[in-house]
Structure formats: structure tokens, C-alpha cells
Amino acid sequence: VLALVAALAAAGCGGEVSVPKTERTEHAGAVLFNQRCSGCHSLDAANAYGSRPTGNRYLKYSERTNGPNFNQRKEKRDDVLFAIRNGGFSGAIMPANVVVGRDARLIADFVSRYSGGSGSEAARAKQR
């Protein structure tokens, strides 16, 4: 199990996040999301593309580790914290307490602000 968690965490390491460093809390949450969550979840603001990579001709179906795509799904802070603490909502493959304490709160703040497609902070920023 630890090997799986380590592999998923390593797979999540991507490039630069698009959240400005001037937004310290959200930027820190985006970096943590990229490092710890992007192996299974997608969210453009964190440069995270773990929910079935688009355009991959070799990957016809979603993988078991694919979590929700937060570009399409809006989340509330308390729901994100619940999912982090309990390993998601459905008892799926997400490990419980994948991050804890301040890191969990930073990720929850970031996801609650930037998730949700056209209603998200990221989408509004692109329109400016």
C-alpha cells in the first residue's frame, strides 16, 4: 500500500502552477495539490492532470486511480477536508489523511476557490 501511495504521489509531480505567488495561501495550496493530488485529480490552476489524460490514444478508459476532475466539479472547503481525512466519499482508492494539518487546510482553501469550471476563480482570471 505504501508503495502505491508513493507511486501516486510521485506521478503527481508536474510543472508550475498558474496561481500568482501574490495570493500566498492559494499559491501554497496549488503547489501542494500539484505535489500530492495531481496523480489522480485534475485542476488547471495547479497544473494537475490526473483524471484520465485527454488526448492519450493508449488510454481508452479511465484508470482505477482517477479521482474527480475539479475543473468540472465545484467543491466546498469542508467537503474537501472531509475527503482528505476519510479517503474520499465513496471508499475508493484515495488514502485517508494523504495530507494533514495546515497542508490539508491549504489544499482545501485552494480547491474550494479554484474548482468548478466556468464559475471558478481560475476561469474568471482567464477572462481578465
Predicted features along the sequence, with ranges:
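Gram-negative bacterial Sec-dependent N-terminal signal peptides
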Residues: 5-6
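C-terminal capping alpha-helices of c-type cytochrome domains
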Residues: 96-128
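Bacterial N-terminal signal peptides that target proteins for export
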Residues: 1-2
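Extracytoplasmic/secreted envelope proteins and their assembly/folding machinery
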Residues: 67, 77, 81-84, 104, ...
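Short, surface-exposed ligand-recognition loops at beta-strand->loop->(often short) alpha-helix junctions
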Residues: 72-73
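Extended amphipathic secondary-structure runs
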Residues: 77, 81-91, 95-97
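C-terminal motif of bacterial Sec signal peptides marking the signal peptidase cleavage site
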Residues: 9-12
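Periplasmic/extracellular electron-transfer cofactor-ligation site
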Residues: 17-25, 30-69, 86-93, 113-123
